[in-house]
Amino acid sequence: MTQIDYTRAAKYFLLQDVWQGFKLGLKYFFAPKATINYPHEKGPLSPRFRGEHALRRYPNGEERCIACKLCEAVCPAQAITIDAEPREDGSRRTTRYDIDMTKCIYCGFCQEACPVDAIVEGPNFEFATETREELFYDKDKLLANGERWEAEIARNLELDAPYR
């Protein structure tokens, strides 16, 4: 006939598995919470975080973009459109710099390709809009983002410099 497995029967009648589960539940119930209350508390961001795009200026106020169009060429989503014209001194500057944020995949290739760190992806990730048209960034919007986030962008680029 069949022998009775006493250890298995003891586990069954003493509800050992249930008590183990209860013990584990109590352990995590009293452990410190890992959840943050997002709108009121924000977690740390990496210096390499890729958020909302921005165009930067030099400290004297001149735009950094030299209209080389490398960012436009390297963009896999074809989200960047640039028009440029030559200036009196022989250099080029952009007349139009548009980014279609509905196409952008935030890969960071534009930032990597830029020889003068003109286009960067800043620390802002809270840029929800009510209309699709607000996601078409023109040069003025990008420059305004750059002015708004310049201190943090410069600090992040400095922290990331050893890895570039």
From Swiss-Prot:
Membrane topology type, per the record?
A: Peripheral membrane protein
Record: residues binding [4Fe-4S] cluster 1 = C65, C68, C71, C114
Protein name according to UniProt:
NADH-quinone oxidoreductase subunit I
Q: Does the keyword Glycoprotein apply?
A: no
Q: Which GO terms describe its cellular component?
A: plasma membrane
Q: Which UniProt keywords apply?
A: 4Fe-4S, Cell inner membrane, Cell membrane, Iron, Iron-sulfur, Membrane, Metal-binding, NAD, Quinone, Repeat, Translocase, Ubiquinone
Q: Matching PROSITE patterns, A to Z?
A: 4FE4S_FER_1, 4FE4S_FER_2
